[in-house]
Amino acid sequence: MHGLLLAGLLALPLNVLAHPTESHSSGISRRAIDITSYRLPQISKYTKSDSLTGQDGQSFTASSADADTSSGDYVSTATNWLKKTLPNASYRLVNDHYIGDSGIGHVHFRQTAHGIDIDNTDFNVNIGRDGKVFSFGNSFYDGEIPKANPMVKRDFSDPVDALHGAIQTLNIPVTAKPENVKAKPVEGKESFKFEGTSGALSDPKAQLVYLQKDGGLVLSWKVETDVGDNWLLSYVDANDKGKVHSVVDYVSAAAYEVYPWGINDPTEGKRSTIHVPWFKTQSVDWHIDGKNWYPTTRGNNAIAQENPTGQREYENNYRPKSPLFIFKYPYSEAMSPPSSYRDASITQLFYTTNVFHDVLYILGFNEKAGNFQTNNWNKGGLGGDYAILNSQDGSGVNNANFATPPDGEPGRMRMYNWNASTPERDGCFEAGIVIHEYTHGVSNRLTGGPANSRCLAALESGGMGEGWSDFFATAIRLKNGDTRATDYTMGEWASNRPNGIRKYRYSTNLTTNPHMYVDADGLTSVHAIGTIWASMLYEMLWNLIDKHGKGDVSKVKPTLKNGVPTDGRHLAMKIVLDGMALQPCLPNFVQARDAIIDADKNLTGGSNKCEIWKAFAKRGLGVGAVYNPSKRTGSNELPAGC
């Protein structure tokens, strides 16, 4: 799950914000089950573009890095590269490959054994504009494959037993009485949908998979349950329903009289009426999905409504209607209760989310890359996955979260009210919270490919997920007069905390924010780790702004020349997005740094290499930095030439 928790606002197991002093406030955490102890292991490797080194000591020189392109397309090139790198591996091509706006082809593979997926093994190949392998990531299992094919003797438990095991072990609020539950086969090998349950937002599912764990493979049932605050993949031992090996959570704890884009919250400016704010090349119209024209806060990219009871249903929930598409409603900080300004809240949430969708589209998060749209207009990717936006959601307080299933399934944002002030405040009016949450959807779709939403499930990967979300929220709120001496908080207005919800402000001053890479040692909160990562990205942001300028931040639409943003602010965002698509599944800081440097190399020929390296090295992620989950090695070293 993804969200804001305070200091941790970003500390829930959802992609949520996180609160520094409060315990987890929703979902599984409410039931005293710590699913963070079930995280997937961090096993990925990333081979960057300027040092292609294969497995088993095999070195690829610049000339030998030319993959076989005789078959004519980037997917074949990637497939041949995998065959060359791991000639004995069994695998399948994941059907989510695409060529990004930066010209890089992204191809993803899943390892198999006896025709069964090894679910946490991934191989991603990035093909450059020249048709050659640019970089690749690998988490394939290199141990001995079990000799016995479990499908021959069907030596595994019934999927219904696995469902019961997940429910009982993790205390999932789903009722599945043995006499009522039936496992109905669906498309896919040993894949089932459970009928006769209650408590989940959709029918639970199960698929037989292997899981790479502790140096071996364990046959498991991957049980999927969406209960709102948690959308879980629980890997239950196929022969012992009481043993859960790992857990992934998809939830990562907007016409329009609104606070305009760039105004973070009511302390920074006034509401105004924005006319036709969408970018016509990115959104035909925010209220059209190709079949219908909705005179309400619904359209191709998002559907926004109130949800005061915190229920799972949303389509019939209240949302403002305007046959003339004039969404102007009263709001002031003094109004109370929140229900008295629900129309303004829903409209603000719909506006902020749609603008961010359009900005991200220009920067490369489009249909092929797995963005959130009902209709993909025949441009690739899977449609049917607008973002569900719940304003004033009654399932929690003092937080927010975003659930990110794979491409083709709608994402879901839950925005809560905050009660640390009188009257209480609505998180929909703090743009940074909305942007933070939506960015969880972006980072989960880009990392590991649109079809794989579990690639930020390891501790350090999940921490970077929180950091990317804070980074975008902060970069977007910059003002024309800001300099590298400007510091920013996160969640300050909603939480009513002058210093916000993070341990330190985001600052380039090491006295104000002393975070270093090695500070991640011993941390178990993704939100605390994320603050370190976002601090590094904030350094990079200002290095690029100092070199390229930040442009006129009052202009919403990014300006690109030959696919490259002309200002340093949007250039930083673009490089970060491209890096997400390059990096391996379950990356660590070092691998994500290398992917960002590779992204700039592909986008600009590496013209910003030193600015990027200086940002990371300043906070201990220089050339000599080494990842070790218990004792990281910091480095301030710069590469030659910088």
Swiss-Prot record:
EC class (word): hydrolase
What the entry lists under PROSITE patterns is as follows: ZINC_PROTEASE
Catalytic residues of the enzyme? E437
User: How the cofactor binds, per note?
Assistant: Binds 1 zinc ion per subunit.
Alphabetical GO CC annotations of the entry are: extracellular region
Q: Does the keyword Lipoprotein apply?
A: no
Quick one: where's region Disordered? 49-72
**Which cell locations does it reside in?**
Secreted
Quote the EC number.
3.4.24.-
**Which is an annotated GO molecular function term of this record?**
metalloendopeptidase activity
Q: Which residues form the signal peptide?
A: 1-18
Question: Superkingdom of this entry's organism?
Answer: Eukaryota
Prodomain residues? 19-253
Q: Which UniProt keywords apply?
A: Glycoprotein, Hydrolase, Metal-binding, Metalloprotease, Protease, Secreted, Signal, Zinc, Zymogen
Does Transferase show up as a keyword for this record? Answer: no
Function noted in UniProt: Secreted metalloproteinase that allows assimilation of proteinaceous substrates and probably acts as a virulence factor.
Recorded family membership: Belongs to the peptidase M36 family.
Q: What is this protein called?
A: Extracellular metalloproteinase 4
